[in-house]
Amino acid sequence: MIIVLSPAKSLDYETPPHVRKHTIPDFVDDAAELIGGLRRLSPQQIASLMDISDQLAHLNFQRYAEWSPKFGTHNAKQAVLAFNGDVYEGFNAKTLSSADLDYAQNHVRVLSGLYGLLRPLDLLQPYRLEMGTRFANPRGKDLYAFWGERITQALNAQLKKNAVASRVLVNCASGEYFKSVKPKLLEAPIITPVFEDWKGGRYKIISFHAKRARGLMARYAVENRIDRPEQLKDFDADGYAFDAEASNDSTYVFRRRVVE
């Protein structure tokens, strides 16, 4: 079983990693090709392309200039320790043991606009390049065209290392990022957990809570060494509970009702 997550815009390179083990991303050459194109953009063009502030544009202009195809602890940090958004607040990798991270290395993947597909301990140099960015490149008009079938093929290769009964992809990524996966070419069923909160008289997805819950779900799977999707139904972190009536074979709905 593999769980896929979205990356985070916010990054933490200040906190020292609590583990030394690291790996190198599989798609460094592809990332270098994208960096080459990004380096041709001015800060103003970056701001326009990504719809970000001038300050952020200048920061990323500098990041692209400093990016190197040679990865080391001097210029990079393990992906799940560097990402610092809502999902990673839930996953909370800095409190996972070395054994937990070793398990995650084989069962968790992070989709990335620049790096394609990352393992948790893959070294990550700071960047910003969301998957939905319409960045024209030699392979097409956007990053979905750039990555094509590569991400799906890499997922298939990893899934084949699992026992047949455990060959399932659990989609804990956003729609923007999961669009980079080709379901028709994926050699495994897909299960998507959905997290809903009671608000305004009905259950609905609240973005901040749903993102955090995706990270909590990934952590739950890692800590409990879950390898079959049925086991995910026991997830109960932060007050969520599986709702069988609202779920089906491909969508697992978890709901919680907090007093308003």
Swiss-Prot record:
Q: Give the record's GO biological process terms.
A: response to hydroperoxide
Q: GO cellular component terms?
A: cytosol
List the residue ranges forming a coiled coil, or say none: none
In terms of Pfam families, this protein maps to: H2O2_YaaD (PF03883)
Disulfide bridge map: none
Q: What protein family is recorded?
A: Belongs to the UPF0246 family.
What's the protein name? UPF0246 protein Bphyt_1375
